[in-house]
């Protein structure tokens, strides 16, 4: 079952953050993920708007966790964590409707 990493955050240090997008792409690709959303101009409906919204689709929750816990990603993740604020990131499982 597909799993989705959904993240939102504000960029607190643009000079430091600029290193994150080009560094994370190859690691995401290595784990077979598909970038579905990368939006810095999302339309808020409820709650507090964040500057960045990202949705990645992985083959499974295990694949998403393998990416997140990949030692190669650790220093790249640190760039994001050190240069952003108000962040959240979750893994959500895909919905499979019950058979009728």
Where are these regions (language model features)?
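Short S/T/G/P-rich N-terminal loop/turn motif that feeds into the first structured element of a domain
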Residues: 1-52, 58-69, 93-100
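C-terminal structural segments of small proteins and small subunits
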Residues: 65, 72-91
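Generic beta-strand structural signal
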Residues: 52-54, 87-88
